[in-house]
Amino acid sequence: MEHKYNKGSEWRKWDLHIHTPYSIYQNYGGTGSFDKFIDALERLPKDVKVIGITDYYFIDGYEKVMEYRQKGRLSNIDKIFPILEFRIDTFGSGNENKLQKINLHILFDIGEDNLKEEIKKIREEFISQIPISSIDKHKTKMLSIDNFTTEGGNDLQKGFSDLVPPTAKVFELLNCETWKNKTFTFLGYKEWSNLEKNNQLKPLKEDLYNRVNAFLSATQRETFLNCQKWLNEYGNKKFLHSGDIHDFSFLDTANTNENGDIVQSTNYYCDTWIKADTTFDGLKQIICEPEDRVKIQIDHPDDKKGYNIIEKIKFVDTSGQDKFPCEEIGLSSGLNAIIGGKSSGKSLLLHLIASEMGNKTDIKNYEQVIKNTSIEIYYKDDPTRKRTKDDARIIEFLPQLHIENLVRNQE
């Protein structure tokens, strides 16, 4: 279910840190809670259009989510990315006594048309190439649930806690021809920011900063601006904000009361807005334009009343000669540019829109062209109902010739 876009970049919420019931560390209640998990994802706030299905080292949770999607579920989400969360072999410290493992998140560019093959490729050419730790006896023991369980003394959680895959190997793969243009990387901010404590070296912290594309944080909104300010001391990489969800208490979108009514979410939060298409290339735009493409806030960064926004237009050709394709043309709620050569119909399009909306516009030069042609206009607040003649909404229309005349008169 790949989405096509014809309206330019738009602000949408991206939540790129949601663990599944298949994650090694989670509190959903195990794999039997997957139906409830999907229900919760389907009731995410309507502004959330991109999610990252995040699991430690493995892609099984993403694969399970996509099984539901291929059966018609999760139509509320435009794009679902797989994200592998790695613990790296450099430690930060929140205090003198407690070491904190730094998390590296790896998002993969993956299409849905050939899903099985792409998942297989990630398993075989990425995950299975990395040992479970850097010590000699594990050189031939690659990442797998079985190897973590065996080395943990038949205890998966212990193996997961004790063993850290070699970070050098992870970055070696990320920089190889297969993956360097197919991955986007984040560091967990909190643990990374503690690297200078407990005698850790700042050069190592700077090296990690330079290796990744952005940072993730689940910090509370009140402290987020300060965190971004501290991060800016190293460069212009952006924070992305998410709740780091591991259980239903923070994915409480599927809760119901005793009457079966949906209860408003109280704990779920994600404040990351990205202005881009919901694609991998869209995400990469935040590297080059971090200030223009990312906003961390509760409300829509460019909220406008739907009453005042033209959502789409449609030509109606009754001549039987197929002068115009009877297709809907989506319009951006921001700036729209009409591009075309001389006499290609740019002014005609604007005149038709203005005329349909009740503006007195001189279209005598186009009378023959527009014979048996009209245009339908749809507003954002009711995009299924075309505008009628008694609609009171108006626009201000300044034709090109009118502007030229104003300039000449000024001269």
Map each language-model feature to its residues.
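Short, well-ordered loop/turn and helix-capping segments at boundaries between secondary-structure elements
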Residues: 289, 350, 355-359, 403, ...
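Aromatic-lined carbohydrate-recognition surfaces of secreted/lumenal glycan-active proteins
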Residues: 171-196
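P-loop NTPase motor core
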Residues: 370-411
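Generic recognition of stable, solvent-exposed alpha-helical segments in well-folded globular domains
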Residues: 278, 308, 330-333, 344-348, ...
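Charged catalytic cores and adjacent phosphate/nucleic-acid-binding surfaces used
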Residues: 1-48, 59-81, 86-115, 189-343
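Phosphate-binding glycine-rich loops of NTP-binding sites
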Residues: 51-54, 110, 332-363
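Alpha-helix N-cap/helix-start capping residues at coil-to-helix junctions, especially the first residue
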Residues: 79-165, 188
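Short beta-strand-centered segment that lines the nucleotide-binding/catalytic pocket of NTP-utilizing
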Residues: 360-374
